[in-house]
């Protein structure tokens, strides 16, 4: 019998099973010869004992009715990845938050990548309602509000975390993290409730409740931001002698020592330790440490080791570092008299840099070409620079000197006179010399 519920009345219609099939080895699928199109999908079929044996599925034909085993319905479930499905994204309806908190967090993360901010806010609220003792929901809400400038709202969220969360240490730690991100990265100066001292207090409270080294590390980072470098270094140094001694700790210790005026020889020891804790082949995690050590070797005029680190960094970055890096490596290569690779790097810097920096890099490239007697190339590069900045006196001067070398004195003097007209006194010496 098909049981229909219509107009608040129960109606039953008798059906005869034409045949039944099995699917997934254990579920029944029934086909009935009769179909009057009156049943509502999902309506139950019951047997003589009143047991539900199937749920109605209307057929696309007019001659059959189908029913699926009700046990199969209990296996149907959604997962966090379903929020990315286009059919769900076309509606304003939110899905139910999964019972597993990790899956629920994944759902929120995936929702944050969509453009529906209302759904995202709703899912965060749903998560907090379902897992009020978990810190993650409050933190996610606070970070969203903070990024939108609602610092008071973010503060209120984290106070709720302190009140309701089971893990009080984690709540204090996340509170300082939310504050710290605003204090370090936001230009806002109106909201005065959050300070580095308050963030430090939260980190220390987290450590007091649960003495995890990560919380101690957080305190050291805040002290560094407060410019209390000696206190910060003391903690970093202590951490470097524990199981928490990772690359970041040694790198931060080196930064503290640099601010305290330590010698380069002391700093390179710490940076060596930072790089030594990176696994090979290097990944992006190692990038800042390898670059910092290369720059330190460069400052110590150990150009060979500096260049080795610069090359490793370029490999880590898949040749897509910024213009500043290629200019830095260019100068190192010039110091090693590796002029051809230096020219390659300065050309690449000019290619990837911001438009306003391009004339500067092109003038530098022309200067090296002049230095190594690539006179025709120096003129061409200087002309490229002058197309972007017609009054660039460096490019005009380099072009003039290159033209002198090419025995094109009238054109050379024209460039040098132009330099003088623009007020650059360097031209006087060369005008007198080549007049």
Question: Model-predicted segments: where are they?
Answer:
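Canonical tetratricopeptide repeat
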Residues: 140, 174, 218, 252, ...
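Terminal, low-structured helical/coil segments at or just beyond the last alpha-helical repeat
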Residues: 401, 405-435
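Residue-level recognition of tetratricopeptide repeat
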Residues: 134, 168, 212-213, 246, ...
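C-terminal cap/linker of serine protease catalytic domains
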Residues: 55-119
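Register position in tetratricopeptide repeats
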Residues: 147, 181-185, 225, 259-260, ...
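Flexible, gly/ser-rich surface segments that form the specificity/activation loops bordering the active-site cleft
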Residues: 1-29, 35-41, 56-67, 84
């Amino acid at each position: 019998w098909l049981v229909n519920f219509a107009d608040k009345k129960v109606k039953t219609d008798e059906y005869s099973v034409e045949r039944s099939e099995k699917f997934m080895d254990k579920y029944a699928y029934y086909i009935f010869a009769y179909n009057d199109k009156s049943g509502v999908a999902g309506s139950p079929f019951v047997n003589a004992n009143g047991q539900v044996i199937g749920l109605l599925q209307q057929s696309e034909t007019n001659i059959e009715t189908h029913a699926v085993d009700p046990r199969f319905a209990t296996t149907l479930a959604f997962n966090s990845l379903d929020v990315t499905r286009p059919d769900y994204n076309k509606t304003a309806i939110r899905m139910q938050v999964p019972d597993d908190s990790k899956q629920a967090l994944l759902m929120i993360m995936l929702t944050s990548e969509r453009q529906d901010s209302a759904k995202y806010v709703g899912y965060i609220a749903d998560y907090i309602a379902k897992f009020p003792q978990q810190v993650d929901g409050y933190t996610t809400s606070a970070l969203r509000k903070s990024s939108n400038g609602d610092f008071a709202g973010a503060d209120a969220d984290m106070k709720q975390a302190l009140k309701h969360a089971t893990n009080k240490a984690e709540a204090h730690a996340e509170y300082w993290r939310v504050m710290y991100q605003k204090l370090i990265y936001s230009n806002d100066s109106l909201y005065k409730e959050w300070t580095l001292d308050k963030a430090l207090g939260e980190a220390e409270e987290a450590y007091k409740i649960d003495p995890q080294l990560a919380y101690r590390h957080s305190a050291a980072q805040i002290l560094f931001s407060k410019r209390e470098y000696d206190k910060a270094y003391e903690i970093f140094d202590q951490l470097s002698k524990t199981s928490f001694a990772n690359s970041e700790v040694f790198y931060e210790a080196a930064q503290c020592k640099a601010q305290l005026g330590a010698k380069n020889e002391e700093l390179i020891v710490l940076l060596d330790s930072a790089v030594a804790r990176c696994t090979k082949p290097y990944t992006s995690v190692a990038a800042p440490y390898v670059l910092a050590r290369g720059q330190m070797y460069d400052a110590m005029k150990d150009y060979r080791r500096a260049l080795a680190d610069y090359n490793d960094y370029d490999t880590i970055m898949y040749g897509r570092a910024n213009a500043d890096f290629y200019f830095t490596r260019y100068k190192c290569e010039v110091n090693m008299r590796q002029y051809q690779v230096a020219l390659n790097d300065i050309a690449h810097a000019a290619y990837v840099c911001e438009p306003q920096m391009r004339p500067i890099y092109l003038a530098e490239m022309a200067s090296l070409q002049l230095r190594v007697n690539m006179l025709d190339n120096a003129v061409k590069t200087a002309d490229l620079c002058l197309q972007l900045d017609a009054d660039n006196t460096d490019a005009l001067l380099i072009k003039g000197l290159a033209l002198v070398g090419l025995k094109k004195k009238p054109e050379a003097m024209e460039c040098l006179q132009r330099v003088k007209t623009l007020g650059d006194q360097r031209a006087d010496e060369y005008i007198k010399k080549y007049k």
